[in-house]
C-alpha cells in the first residue's frame, strides 16, 4: 500500500531561469566532451537581467567559443528579444572559468582507468516504479509532459502568445493498492504576451495542454484547475528571477517520491559521481522493476573521494519485492559494476548527451541513437554514434529475472 493518498510533484520549462542556467552548463560540458573525453568539467551558470555568468573549474585540451555557445543556448530557448525579458544576442556574457584543483585531480586520476577514484564523497539514489510506462512516478512524469507541451506549442507557433517561462504542478490521488487513480489538482503558470485575454488563456491552456497530456480518465469532476492563478505573467525569465545551475534537483529526478543525495547534475562530467552514480542508480532500479523483482525500487550508493569501490550499496523495495531486498543487493553487485570508471563505460557516458537532460527531467525519457561530428587537431573529421539517455535501457532485466529464479 502506498504511504500517500495524495502526492504532488512539480516541473519547470526550459525557459525557467534555473533551467536556462542548467542548459548553458550542460551545453558547455557537451561542447568540451565532444572534443576531449579526458576533460574534467564543473561548470556553473548564473543568469539575471541582461547578463549570463559562467564559472567553475575546467581542465581540457579543447577550445570552445564560450560566449557564442551561451548566446546560442539562450536564443534556442526563445529569449531573443528584450520584450520577452532576455535577449541572447545582446546580453553580457562573463567567463570566470578556472582549472580543476590539483588536490582533487590526484584523488581521481589513476594509471589504471578502472581504479579511478570518485570525484567526491557523497550519497546518490536511483528509483523506479511500475505505475507508469516510463517507470517514473506519475506526478513528476506528467508534470514534465505539461511544460514540454507548453514549449512545443510555443515553438511551433500554435499558441503564439506563449512565452518561454512556465511551471507545472500536479497532485495525484493514489488508491489503496498504491496506484495513481485520479488528478486532484493541476497548477500551470505560463508566461505570455501582454495582450492575451486571461479567460482565453485559461481555456486554451486547459484544452491544448492539460487535456492533451493527462489521460482523460484521471481528470474528474472534482479535479481542481489553477491556471495562471495570480493573473498576468508577462514578466518572466531572468528578469523575474535570478537563475542558477543546480537549483531544481527534485524536478530533475523523481519529484520528491524518492530520496535525494543533494548533488546536482548539470555542468558535471561523468567523473563526478553526483551525476554518473545517480544515473547508474536509475539504471539499476529500472532494471530491477522491469525484471519483475519489485513494483518499486530505490537504491542508495555512496562513495569516498579518491576511492573507486562504493562505500555502500543498499536497496529498499517498500514491501513490494518478490525476493528479499538483501538478495536484490547481491544481484546488483553481481550484475552492475558501480565503480566510477565502470559506470562511465557501462553507460557509455563520454558523449555530448547532457544538454538534452537539462530540461524536462533526467529520468523517464526514451533512449535513442544519435551521432555527432568532431574535428581532431589534424583537421580530420570523425563521426561518433551513441545512445542518449542510456540509463533508461532495460537490457539487464532478463538476466536479473533469471538470476532471481523468477
From Swiss-Prot:
The EC number(s) this enzyme carries = 2.5.1.6
UniProt binding sites for ATP: 16, 165-167, 241, 247-248, 264, 268
Q: Which GO terms describe its biological process?
A: one-carbon metabolic process; S-adenosylmethionine biosynthetic process
Q: How is the cofactor bound?
A: Binds 2 divalent ions per subunit. Binds 1 potassium ion per subunit.
Q: In which pathway does it act?
A: Amino-acid biosynthesis; S-adenosyl-L-methionine biosynthesis; S-adenosyl-L-methionine from L-methionine: step 1/1
Which top EC class applies here? transferase
Gene Ontology annotations for the cellular component aspect, listed alphabetically: cytoplasm
Name its co-factor(s). Answer: Mg(2+); K(+)
Annotated residues for binding of Mg(2+):
18
**Which keywords does this Swiss-Prot/TrEMBL entry list?**
ATP-binding, Cytoplasm, Magnesium, Metal-binding, Nucleotide-binding, One-carbon metabolism, Potassium, Transferase
Purpose: Catalyzes the formation of S-adenosylmethionine (AdoMet) from methionine and ATP. The overall synthetic reaction is composed of two sequential steps, AdoMet formation and the subsequent tripolyphosphate hydrolysis which occurs prior to release of AdoMet from the enzyme.
Q: Where is this region: Flexible loop?
A: 100-110
Using the chain's own numbering, where are the disulfide bonds? Answer: none
Q: Which domain of life does the protein's organism represent?
A: Bacteria
Print the organism lineage.
Bacteria, Pseudomonadati, Pseudomonadota, Gammaproteobacteria, Oceanospirillales
Which organism is the protein's source?
Answer: Chromohalobacter salexigens (strain ATCC BAA-138 / DSM 3043 / CIP 106854 / NCIMB 13768 / 1H11)
Q: Which PANTHER family match?
A: S-ADENOSYLMETHIONINE SYNTHETASE
| Reactions accelerated catalytically | L-methionine + ATP + H2O = S-adenosyl-L-methionine + phosphate + diphosphate
Ligand binding (L-methionine): 57, 100, 241, 272
Q: From the Swiss-Prot or TrEMBL record, state where the protein is found.
A: Cytoplasm
Q: What is the protein name stated in its UniProt record? A: S-adenosylmethionine synthase
Q: What is its main location?
A: cytoplasm
Which residues of the sequence carry a binding annotation for K(+)? 44
The record's note on quaternary structure and interaction partners says: Homotetramer; dimer of dimers.
Amino acid at each position: 500500500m502506498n504511504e500517500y493518498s495524495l502526492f504532488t510533484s512539480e516541473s519547470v520549462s526550459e525557459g525557467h531561469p534555473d533551467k536556462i542556467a542548467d542548459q548553458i552548463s550542460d551545453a558547455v560540458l557537451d561542447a568540451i566532451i565532444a572534443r576531449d573525453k579526458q576533460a574534467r568539467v564543473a561548470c556553473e551558470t548564473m543568469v539575471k537581467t541582461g547578463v549570463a555568468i559562467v564559472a567553475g573549474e575546467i581542465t581540457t585540451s579543447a577550445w570552445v567559443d564560450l560566449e557564442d555557445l551561451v548566446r546560442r543556448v539562450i536564443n534556442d530557448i526563445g529569449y531573443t528579444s528584450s520584450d520577452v525579458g532576455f535577449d541572447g544576442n545582446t546580453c553580457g556574457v562573463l567567463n570566470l572559468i578556472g582549472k580543476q584543483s590539483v588536490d582533487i585531480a590526484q584523488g581521481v586520476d589513476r594509471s589504471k582507468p578502472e581504479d579511478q577514484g570518485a570525484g567526491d564523497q557523497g550519497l546518490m539514489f536511483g528509483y523506479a516504479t511500475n505505475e507508469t510506462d516510463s517507470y517514473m512516478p506519475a506526478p513528476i512524469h506528467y508534470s514534465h509532459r505539461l511544460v514540454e507541451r507548453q514549449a512545443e506549442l510555443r515553438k511551433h507557433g500554435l499558441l503564439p502568445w506563449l512565452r518561454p517561462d512556465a511551471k507545472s504542478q500536479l497532485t495525484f490521488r493514489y488508491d489503496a493498492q498504491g496506484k495513481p487513480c485520479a488528478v486532484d489538482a493541476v497548477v500551470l503558470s505560463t508566461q505570455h504576451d501582454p495582450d492575451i485575454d486571461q479567460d482565453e488563456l485559461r481555456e486554451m491552456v486547459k484544452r491544448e495542454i492539460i487535456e492533451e497530456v493527462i489521460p482523460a480518465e484521471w481528470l474528474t469532476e472534482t479535479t481542481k484547475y489553477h491556471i495562471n492563478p495570480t493573473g498576468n505573467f508577462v514578466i518572466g525569465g531572468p528578469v523575474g528571477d535570478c537563475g542558477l545551475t543546480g537549483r531544481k534537483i527534485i524536478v530533475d529526478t523523481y519529484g520528491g517520491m524518492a530520496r535525494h543525495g543533494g548533488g546536482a547534475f548539470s555542468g558535471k562530467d561523468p567523473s563526478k559521481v553526483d551525476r554518473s552514480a545517480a544515473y547508474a542508480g536509475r539504471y539499476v532500479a529500472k532494471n530491477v522493476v522491469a525484471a519483475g523483482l519489485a513494483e518499486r525500487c530505490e537504491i542508495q550508493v555512496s562513495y569516498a573521494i579518491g576511492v573507486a569501490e562504493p562505500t555502500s550499496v543498499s536497496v529498499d523495495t517498500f514491501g513490494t519485492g518478490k525476493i528479499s531486498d538483501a538478495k536484490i543487493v547481491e544481484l546488483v553487485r553481481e550484475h552492475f559494476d558501480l565503480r566510477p570508471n565502470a559506470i562511465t563505460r557501462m553507460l557509455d557516458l563520454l558523449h555530448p548527451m547532457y544538454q538534452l537532460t537539462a530540461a524536462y527531467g533526467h529520468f523517464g525519457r526514451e533512449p535513442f541513437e544519435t551521432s555527432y561530428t568532431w574535428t581532431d587537431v589534424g583537421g580530420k573529421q570523425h563521426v561518433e554514434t551513441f545512445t542518449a539517455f542510456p540509463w533508461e535501457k532495460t537490457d539487464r532485466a532478463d538476466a536479473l529475472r533469471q538470476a532471481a529464479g523468477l
